[in-house]
């Protein structure tokens, strides 16, 4: 009886059809439920038995048997069989798998049942049959060396996804989705956090995670020869092309070229040809023949603009030589090329190129030359930091930020590096809680780095800026830093004095009052002849000195800094009168006195702990400052 049931399942498959049960917006991002059936593998005894049974059933477009009662019974039976097979994937306690597959994004291997995969896919049938006959496990027509992944204890085979799907990347979620279809005959809707990005302003119908998920599914469906899914995913990809940014069209074009999807490929080529995507990106991201085709279309459709773009072949040649030197990780050669020609790093957009295509070491060495404008925008309105955010490489983002890249710079369409990174990050990766000692997700790490920088530098203020709004922001930042340093001098005078000496904060005038050396207590006189640019430089120099003071305090006196953080965030009152212990009702005065005693004890403990932990810090301060080290009064 079980054998007959298996034959009936295969016989019913050709008469099944695709059913969509949701709106088109859900369909576009791959999250709509649909049911698709697979044609028989066409190899082995199972396929030989399927043909006569299918003929006996009639094989028509709608039915699977004789009467209506028989049809309904078969539908119920098939749904029950589908649910039972799905348990093999979902129920961790029911582990009767006999092979494993390592996926591209790491983590534990995915267990599979070779008998089910072989019955449902000619790819897996050929792969496992070749291994059973003593072969290397390579499936004919592009299966890869699946058997080369090694053996577990007990002879359990292990396959690598990059060998099963050569030329394409398939992540865990996309592979599990395809497995679910092979096991159950139904393509379940994609989880929302897999096809949605971490940008709260995104509608999530065509954001990069949804595109990547469908691209990965297409790679897998093409490699596993699941023809009906190829047709479904092709329609989804066609829907994405005109709705998303041109950068997100590139992976669609790549999978269309790899999987020979002519309609998708032609539509992607037309979209990119109409865009302002530069030739460097075309040459680096696309197959050579496709890049040439796009350039030819541009020259034919816009001949006049084509002549102006390639106006200086010598200049273009010099730019390509610098880019090739960067590809070779040879920054010394870049310096030689700059010396022997009149071209600059900015002319060649060398920093943009390195941020997009080179490793962090090359970017760091290029920044050390101090010959490139960190915030220069290329022809498409992107800075090097924007390109590093698109690449989602934490080391490169940190290199640029440490050298002074402006985190608040916007692209032509109003995107910041933070919003770019959020748009490229899956909600699943953003919300994943990392255990201690576990490697952090790179996408989430990039967002955290940019987020901290946005908090530290909420707005880049140029020397020439005279906008009242920007000036107010600078004043607010100065007031916060002045208050923080003032409370540090009140609570921790010795530590504050050392930190201010090393940061040279005592050489810049305080904001709004006379320097501490003066005892008049009067407000600082306003220089009416001071230009806005001069005033801005003076205020920024004070901000830099105070910022360095705070950073030194966090580095060498962390416990004192924690007390200051808590006081400024939780205990600092809105009104100065609230600090007076004599004001307020008797209950309020008691609360103030209790909190004052608690704060006093926190200050004493932090002072003692930092003093014990940093007993050698006075040596550092004496070597970092021209003035003699301060003498700390003994208690």
Swiss-Prot record:
InterPro entries noted in UniProt: Ankyrin_rpt, Ankyrin_rpt-contain_sf, BTB/POZ_dom, NPR, NPR1/NIM1-like_C, NPR_central_dom, SKP1/BTB/POZ_sf
GO biological process terms held by the UniProt record: defense response to bacterium; defense response to fungus; regulation of jasmonic acid mediated signaling pathway; regulation of salicylic acid mediated signaling pathway; systemic acquired resistance, salicylic acid mediated signaling pathway
Compositionally biased tracts (Gly residues): 138-152
Chain intervals annotated as zinc finger (C2HC NPR-type): 194-208
Binding site for Zn(2+): 197, 202, 204, 207
Coiled coil: none
Protein's pathway: Protein modification; protein ubiquitination
Keyword annotations: ANK repeat, Metal-binding, Nucleus, Plant defense, Repeat, Ubl conjugation pathway, Zinc, Zinc-finger
SUPFAM superfamilies: Ankyrin repeat, POZ domain
Binding site for salicylate: 484
Repeat listed as a keyword: yes
PROSITE patterns, per the entry: ANK_REP_REGION (PS50297), ANK_REPEAT (PS50088), BTB (PS50097), ZF_C2HC_NPR (PS52046)
UniProt GO molecular function: zinc ion binding
Chain positions of ANK repeats: 317-347, 349-376, 380-409
Subunit details: Interacts with NRR. Interacts with TGAL1 and TGAL11.
Role, per record: Salicylic acid (SA)-binding substrate-specific adapter of an E3 ubiquitin-protein ligase complex (CUL3-RBX1-BTB) which mediates the ubiquitination and subsequent proteasomal degradation of target proteins. May be involved in regulating basal defense responses against pathogens, and may be involved in crosstalk between SA- and JA-dependent signaling pathways. Does not seem to be involved in defense response against the bacterial blight disease caused by Xanthomonas oryzae pv. oryzae (Xoo). Over-expression of NPR2/NH2 does not confer disease resistance to Xoo.
Family per similarity comment: Belongs to the plant 'ANKYRIN-BTB/POZ' family. 'NPR1-like' subfamily.
Listed PANTHER family: REGULATORY PROTEIN NPR3 (PTHR46475:SF2)
Name of the protein: BTB/POZ domain and ankyrin repeat-containing protein NPR2
Organism (species): Oryza sativa subsp. japonica (Rice)
Gene coding for it: NPR2
């Amino acid at each position: 009886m079980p054998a007959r049931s298996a034959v009936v399942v295969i016989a019913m498959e050709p008469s099944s059809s695709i059913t969509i049960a949701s709106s088109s917006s859900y369909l576009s991002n791959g999250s709509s439920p649909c049911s698709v059936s697979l044609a028989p593998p066409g190899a082995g005894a199972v396929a030989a038995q399927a043909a006569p049974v299918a003929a006996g059933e009639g094989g028509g477009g709608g039915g699977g048997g004789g009467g209506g009662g028989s049809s309904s019974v078969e539908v119920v039976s098939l749904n029950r069989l589908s649910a039972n097979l799905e348990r093999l994937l979902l129920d961790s306690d029911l582990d009767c798998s006999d092979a494993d597959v390592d996926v591209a994004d790491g983590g534990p291997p995915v267990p599979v049942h070779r008998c089910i995969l072989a019955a449902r896919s000619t790819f897996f049938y050929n792969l496992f049959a070749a291994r059973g006959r003593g072969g290397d496990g390579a499936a004919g027509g592009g299966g890869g060396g699946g058997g080369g992944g090694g053996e577990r204890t007990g002879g359990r085979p292990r396959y690598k996804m990059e060998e099963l799907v050569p030329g394409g990347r398939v992540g865990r979620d996309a592979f599990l989705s395809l497995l679910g279809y092979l096991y159950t005959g139904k393509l379940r809707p994609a989880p929302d956090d897999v096809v949605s990005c971490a940008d709260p302003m995104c509608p999530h119908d065509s954001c990069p995670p949804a595109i990547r998920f469908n691209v990965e599914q297409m790679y897998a469906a093409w490699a596993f020869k699941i023809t009906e899914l190829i047709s479904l995913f092709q329609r989804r990809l066609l829907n994405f092309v005109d709705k998303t940014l041109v950068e997100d069209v590139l992976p669609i074009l790549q999978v269309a070229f790899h999987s020979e999807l002519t309609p998708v490929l032609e539509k992607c080529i037309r979209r990119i040809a109409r865009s302002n995507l530069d030739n460097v990106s075309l040459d680096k991201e696309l197959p050579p023949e496709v890049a040439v085709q796009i350039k030819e279309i541009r020259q034919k459709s816009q001949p006049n603009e084509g002549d102006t773009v390639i106006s200086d072949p010598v200049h273009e040649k010099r730019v390509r030589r610098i880019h090739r030197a960067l590809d070779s990780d040879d920054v010394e050669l870049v310096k030689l090329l700059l010396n022997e020609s009149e071209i600059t790093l900015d002319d060649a957009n060398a920093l943009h190129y390195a941020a997009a295509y080179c490793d962090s070491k090359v970017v760091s060495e290029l920044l050390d030359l101090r010959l490139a404008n960190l915030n220069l925008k290329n022809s498409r309105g992107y800075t090097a930091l924007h390109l590093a955010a698109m690449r989602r490489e934490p080391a490169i983002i940190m290199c640029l930020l440490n050298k002074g890249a402006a985190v608040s710079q916007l692209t032509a369409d109003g995107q910041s590096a933070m919003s770019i990174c959020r748009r490229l990050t899956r909600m699943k990766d953003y919300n994943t809680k990392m255990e201690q000692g576990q490697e952090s997700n790179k996408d989430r790490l990039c967002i955290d780095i940019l987020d901290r920088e946005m908090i530290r530098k909420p707005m880049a203020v140029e020397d020439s800026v005279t906008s009242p709004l920007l000036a107010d922001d600078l004043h607010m930042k100065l007031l916060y830093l002045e208050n923080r340093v003032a409370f540090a001098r009140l609570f921790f005078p010795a530590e504050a004095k050392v930190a201010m000496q090393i940061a040279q904060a005592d050489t810049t005038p305080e904001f709004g009052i006379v320097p501490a050396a003066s005892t008049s207590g009067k407000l600082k006189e306003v220089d009416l002849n001071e230009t806005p640019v001069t005033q801005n430089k003076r205020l920024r120099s004070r901000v830099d000195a105070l910022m360095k003071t705070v950073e030194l305090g966090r580095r060498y006196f962390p416990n004192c800094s924690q007390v200051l953080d808590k006081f400024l965030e939780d205990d600092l009152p809105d009104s100065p009168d609230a600090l007076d212990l004599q004001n307020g009702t008797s209950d309020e005065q008691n609360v103030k006195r209790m909190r004052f005693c608690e704060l006093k004890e926190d200050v004493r403990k932090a002072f003692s702990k930092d003093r014990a932990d940093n007993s050698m810090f006075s040596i550092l301060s004496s070597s970092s400052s021209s003035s003699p080290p301060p003498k700390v009064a003994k208690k």
